[in-house]
């Protein structure tokens, strides 16, 4: 039998209820159990077993809480994404905004809002997959409409260039796949996914709007692109990338050396801008070329 230490009057008062297991657990800390008669009826092995059981219960409770948290976050983000597209569908239907502007605003906002919503998910390792479920559902919706299985004319009109259902299987589908890929493989701990989505959503999206409005002077090697669009892509892509990195740094997910980060992001933005300006759109959609080029450049710059 393990030796016990003398008890103070307070010890006696706390532990005289030792026959009641509930009271013992409440008033006798692990320290008391080791050195006092509160340990009546328990062996060292029994105490260790109880501690393991408690840890198991706590772990199960935490896992359940994380699961419910992530399910709720998924529902909220999915609802927000649907509401965003629905609102622009309505605006396009009522001719409040042009189809081309509606498409680009959806392009800009849906991806950036998705990235901004990542912190509402839990800290579990499975949280990224719950987040990725949102673009997965939207991708399935695009496939269903793109194959004309259940076409939604307003969706087609609001997110395509020419209003054809098969267009949903190109740029828009590549777009949601880029969101899914960034969430699963980079998530909140890497600047790579954030920068790639900033360039694809913000930089490329704003480049198109500015190019249409101010793009009279074309780039010599690609008459479909303008200096105004390319300059806008570099500037807005750079600042949106920095804003996202600062956002995640302030929340404690990233730890950046800002002097080198500014230089690296500028370099990545330049690479993405040059790739977007190349005359390869007919062969490779911007929603593939821009995120791929950005991911490669960001990986070479940041290394994680």
From Swiss-Prot:
The chain crosses the membrane at residues 71-91, 105-125, 129-149, 167-187, 191-211, 227-247. Its EC number is 2.7.1.182. InterPro entries: Phytol/farnesol_kinase (IPR039606). Residues 1-59 form a transit peptide. Pathway: Cofactor biosynthesis; tocopherol biosynthesis. GO terms for molecular function: phytol kinase activity. Disruption phenotype: 50% reduction in tocopherol content in leaves. Plants able to grow on soil and to produce fertile seeds. Vte5 and vte6 double mutants can grow photoautotrophically and show a stay-green phenotype with strongly delayed senescence and extended lifetime. It catalyses: phytol + CTP = phytyl phosphate + CDP + H(+). It is found in: Plastid, Chloroplast membrane. It is an enzyme of class 2 (transferase). One of its GO terms (biological process) is vitamin E biosynthetic process. Kinase involved in the activation and reutilization of phytol from chlorophyll degradation in plant metabolism, including tocopherol biosynthesis. Catalyzes the conversion of phytol to phytol monophosphate (PMP) in the presence of CTP or UTP. No activity with ATP or GTP as phosphoryl donor. This is Phytol kinase 1, chloroplastic. The gene is VTE5.
């Amino acid at each position: 039998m393990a030796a016990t230490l003398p008890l103070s009057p307070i010890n006696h008062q706390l532990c005289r209820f030792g026959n009641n297991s509930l009271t013992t657990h409440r008033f006798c800390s692990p320290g008391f159990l080791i050195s006092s008669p509160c340990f009546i009826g328990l062996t060292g092995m029994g105490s260790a077993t109880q501690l393991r059981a408690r840890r198991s219960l706590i772990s199960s409770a935490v896992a359940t809480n994380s699961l419910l948290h992530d399910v709720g976050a998924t529902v909220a983000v999915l609802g927000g994404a649907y509401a965003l597209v629905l609102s622009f569908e309505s605006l396009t239907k009522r001719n409040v905004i042009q189809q081309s502007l509606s498409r680009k605003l959806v392009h800009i906002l849906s991806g950036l809002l998705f990235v901004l919503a990542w912190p509402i998910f839990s800290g579990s390792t499975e949280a990224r997959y719950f987040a990725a479920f949102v673009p997965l559902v939207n991708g399935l919706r695009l496939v269903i409409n793109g194959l004309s299985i259940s076409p939604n004319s307003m969706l087609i009109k609001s997110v395509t260039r020419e209003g054809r259902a098969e267009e949903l299987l190109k740029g828009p589908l590549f777009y949601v796949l880029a969101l899914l890929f960034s969430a699963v493989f980079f998530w909140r701990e890497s600047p790579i996914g954030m920068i790639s989505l900033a360039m694809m959503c913000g930089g490329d999206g704003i480049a198109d709007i500015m190019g249409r409005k101010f793009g009279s002077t074309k780039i010599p090697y690609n008459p479909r692109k303008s200096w105004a669009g390319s300059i806008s892509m570099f500037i807005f892509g750079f600042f949106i990338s920095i804003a996202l990195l600062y956002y995640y740094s302030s929340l404690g997910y990233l730890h950046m050396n800002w002097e080198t980060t500014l230089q690296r992001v500028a370099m990545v933005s330049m690479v993405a801008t040059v790739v977007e300006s190349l005359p390869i759109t007919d062969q490779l959609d911007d929603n593939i070329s821009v995120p791929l080029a950005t991911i490669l450049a960001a990986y070479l710059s940041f290394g994680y």
